[in-house]
Amino acid sequence: MAEASKYKKLTPIDHVLIRPEMYVGSVDTSSSSMFVFDHEKGRMVWESLKVNHGLLKIVDEILLNASDNIANKGGRMTYIRVHITEAGEITIENDGAGIPIVRSKEHKLYIPEMVFGHLLTSSNYDDTSQNAVAGRHGYGAKLTNILSHRFSVCCRTKGKEFHMSWHDHMRRATAPRVSNVDPKEKNLTRVKFLPDYERFGLDANKISHDMKRVLHKRIMDLAAMFPSIEISLNGVPFAFKSFADYAMLYSSPSSSGEMPPAPFVYESRNGAIAFIPSLTAGTRRIFGVVNGVVTHNGGTHCNAAQEVLQSSLESVEKALKKDNKVIDTNRVLRHFMILVFLVQVQPKFDSQNKARLVSVPTMPRVPRQELMDFLLRMPFLEAHVNTVTGQLADELNKEMGAGRRMSSKSLISSITKLVDATTTRRDPRFVRTLIVTEGDSAKALAQNSLSSDQKRYTGVFPLRGKLLNVRNKNLKRLKNCKELQELFCALGLELGKIYKDAEELRYQRLLVMTDQDADGSHIKGLVINAFEALWPSLLNRNPGFISIFSTPIVKVRLRDKSTHSFFSLKEFHKWQKTHGNVSYTAKYYKALGTSTTAEGKEYFKDMDKHTMRLVVERNDHKLLDSVFDSQEVEWRKDWMTKANAYTGEVDIDRSKKTLTVPDFVHKEMVHFALAGNARALAHAVDGLKPSQRKILWAIMRRSGNESAKVAQLSGYISEVSAFHHGEMSLQETIIKMAQNFTGGNNINLLIPEGQFGSRQQLGNDHAAARYIFTKLSSLARILFPSEDEPLLDYVTEEGQQVEPNHYVPILPLLLCNGSVGIGFGFASNIPPFHPLDVSAAVRSMINGEAAKVVVRRLVPWAVGYQGEVRRGPEGEFIAAGSYQYYVDGRVHVTEIPWTLSIEAFRDHISVLASKDVVQRIADYSGANHVDIDLELTNGAMTTYAECESELSLTQRIYINGTVFSPTGVLTPLEGDLAPVLQWHYDRRLDLYKKRRQRNLGLLEAELAREKSTLKFVTHFREGKIDIVNATDDSLAKTCSKLGMVRVDDSYDYVLRKPITFYTKTSLENLNRKISETEKRIDKLKKTAPVQMWLDELDRFDRAFEEHENTAVATILKERRVNPPTGDVSRNLQQPRLELEEVKVSSSGGKSVPMRVRVRKYVPPPPSKRPHVGQSVGGGGGGGSVRSSAAAVVAHVKAEKKAARARSMQKMLLDVVARQVARVLPRLPWFLF
């Protein structure tokens, strides 16, 4: 019966309430990037906003009901009015045909009652109808009703007026009221509703600022779709005379203020389409609307609109080819934003959410010649012509020796790393091949493994590290890349030349030979990218010019000494599953240097077996652009999100002899991208990156906790944890994990012994790894209890078990220490928080508070910080340093933001000194404290805000996190850290349950063993067991008869004891141990998992508080005994801002107070500096702005200089006047 109780049948209303995402999309607020209107700039801007798509959808349903009425021929519609109150109640009203106020003959209900209060009621079920409306399924307005606290409707049609209200999520309603009104009064439909904001995870009766902007934009889109209708929001109409007016709002100026050409707009009966140019290339964006429905996920109409632009650009490309110009259409596309607003009959969407159009659209017939002429006029077109001519290209060609044949002697002297083919003669039986290897060790393998005959036609050239990404043809960067220059020179390539045949080159094939790991895939990709970007025709017309040489990644040796080679881990894992009972030894080849010369000779003996020919199609440059172009961030994010979500193994089919670019990108290059993200981005639960996790695991498994030299420790960690990325990077990570200065780690998992860096350079001033020592910190062992280790999931590398997939510390370490990382398409910047506050947050969640509530109280903090954290104007956090400003112009700086190094602060002050803002600096700072005296020019600062800004004493702290979730999925958090708290809470609590169960099992097994031992000892002492004359078998039978438990299938735990074990003292000890074990079992049974957690949190809190007190005391002790004193300037001294109110849960749950509080945002006081005539924006208007401190000082100096000049002039005039007055009386009268 218990199983049967799990099955439930819900009412349709309850189903909507329990599973709203099925009908209206997600009801969780998440960060989404979209266009919104910026009132200050007067145009659309692309911003990341906190959007609740479910709330947007229920408002949209009523808006679309109103807009659908436009197509109703029963009466002309003139307006749609939307009003949103401060209390969050929304009213949408429209005139027009109106809803018939009659009872349905079939259902005996009024039509408005059915339309707004009964699911699956609609007038749009006739699929033969030619009306272009948004409604289709009969859910629409009813979903809004169900997801609202209250919902009312007023309909006036043909002299009758209908009123009805619903509440309790459409479960209860008032009786419909129908009255007669003046038939001359206009028809109307008015819907008023109050959404259930708490159901959408929002504050009660409150629409956020971001959601107001999103709704404003949504209503604006509707106004653009129907410019003949007056559509207004809160009494303010959107006055679009045409679609072109709306499209102009998407035009944005360049960084220099220059405006792009006006958009290309075409309107027809089927809708409107606009191509909006931008002077700077960006991510391709398309915004589509169908019958008023915003299709957030695009669809067939967006694809068709892009195809219109693409085909027109191809026509432009053909026209320019006549002038020997080859245009890169893919890059030109990035200069355009596309709007497509369609009017469609019977459109079909992917779901009730209507986020994507799936039916074939009827597109406006855009005049192609007009569009082509428009494209040819674009000012940025010339910048994307694929030519590399010019002085710089000529210089590079000259440096590389391009365009002339070079002798082997010249090549040897100019390219020392090149081992050239021994003959220059051509032989049709052999393809002259240049092998490009990853590093010198791979070069040695190739060179030592090639036969004498192969060396006649095969050269070898090693590459060091990562190649330059030349996707955007940045020849200035290429000029500084010696490796690529030498590679091009070895091949005889010339920049700017179009190659039709590889026979024009010194080598007819480039064989790329790299390690079989993610970094090797990246190097292959960069080589392909370089040649496709600079010489696309060479690859298009010569399939296989670039070929990939593959070597085994795993070799298996069976008992019969036969071997199997596997070229991918996917292939090896598949073999393992089908040969589970086979005994074998596996050797992993992570690098080419692992292969012996004998193995290398085996590879090159049959080169064709190991070689795949790369085939490059004409349109493959689009995909390579998306991967390597720095501006295609959003594409890479989407690519990584899909790749990370895929749970299977992806790899190239090495049995095929050809490789396409899409296969290489999606099946091999993707491994580098995924590995790059795994290395750079932290795990949400333990806050660690793989290298940090390997270090922690390896150090914790060492016997004892003796200090070890960092350089030696890195070698040990590499060996035991299968680390493959160089010991230098490992040493840097070890050093960073031990740094404990303010702004380093709030919790340093390793102890620093030596110079591990300081606030002077934020840790970059550490000593070399061979001079410094470290060991595990005591806090690390508290955070990562040893009892957890048997319960964790571990990673297997090279056939051995290494570190856990992720740890589950007692606190979310990600929040304690923060995390910064730049991955492939994703980046993360999570600030640190006070560990005791994180502990308080966890305690609050244990007490029943929601993570969303708790996380709002967390404030970024660095242990030892002596400043304060404020709220910024946009809701962000601001770290503010502290200072004393004295009336004589002296400033004593005692703290700077923890994200700023003391050296960087000094450099900034030096710049101000060069502008005469600062007259003197005296730095008394140490490793972990700030103590700096400044003398400022009189009048340079007039308010405390100017002082903080000019002296760089404030830094904004933004939260932009991307982490790996507990299931390993890459998850962007944007500014919301609540998921981190929740994921950690769930995993840690689950671990305590498992640990409690395991410990109970161990204690009960121990008790059973002790009781069995007691039985045996008691029987022995009573003379019932004769050990002297017994055999091993008879003793085992005796133990079995006594009901003793077996341990490891034997009774050795009692039979192998010394004779002293059977003494009276031992018996007493055994009874005492049994009593203690029983007490431990009883105590553990009474201890809930959360209590186990609280006990360990108590232990951590005590230890950390002692650690923090010591750190702070050290900082205060290092300060000067006699700091500066004097009268403080009231105008320039920092104010003590009020603390923000603490947000507590309204749904119960006891809040645990936190130590760090954020101070309220207060607008800075107005500047008292004089205007110095700097014009605003470079345009007209002749305005002026308050100047910087440097400009004010310069202005004051100029004024003083001018005043001195005027004084001198006045003095000279006075002297002359006195002399003239003395001489005049003595002159003869006739002179006058």
From Swiss-Prot:
GO term, biological process aspect, one: resolution of meiotic recombination intermediates
Gene for this chain: TOP2
Primary role: Control of topological states of DNA by transient breakage and subsequent rejoining of DNA strands. Topoisomerase II makes double-strand breaks.
SUPFAM superfamilies, per the entry: ATPase domain of HSP90 chaperone/DNA topoisomerase II/histidine kinase, Ribosomal protein S5 domain 2-like, Type II DNA topoisomerase
Topo IIA-type catalytic domain boundaries: 681-1097
Listed EC numbers: 5.6.2.2
Similarity field: Belongs to the type II topoisomerase family.
Biased composition (Gly residues): 1175-1184
Binding site for ATP: 65, 94, 122-124, 135-142, 352-354
Swiss-Prot/TrEMBL cofactor(s): Mg(2+); Mn(2+); Ca(2+)
Name used for this protein in its record: DNA topoisomerase 2
Keyword Metal-binding carried by entry: yes
Site, Transition state stabilizer: residue positions: R770
List of residues binding Mg(2+) 2: D515, D517
SMART domains found in the cross-reference section: TOP2c (SM00433), TOP4c (SM00434)
Region (Interaction with DNA) location: 952-961
Source organism (scientific name): Trypanosoma cruzi
Sites annotated Important for DNA bending: I822
InterPro entries: DNA_Topoisomerase_II, HATPase_C_sf, Ribosomal_Su5_D2-typ_SF, Ribsml_uS5_D2-typ_fold_subgr, Topo_IIA, Topo_IIA-like_dom_sf, Topo_IIA_A/C_ab, Topo_IIA_A_a_sf
Note, other: Eukaryotic topoisomerase I and II can relax both negative and positive supercoils, whereas prokaryotic enzymes relax only negative supercoils.
Cofactor note (record): Binds two Mg(2+) per subunit. The magnesium ions form salt bridges with both the protein and the DNA. Can also accept other divalent metal cations, such as Mn(2+) or Ca(2+).
Keyword match Translocase: no
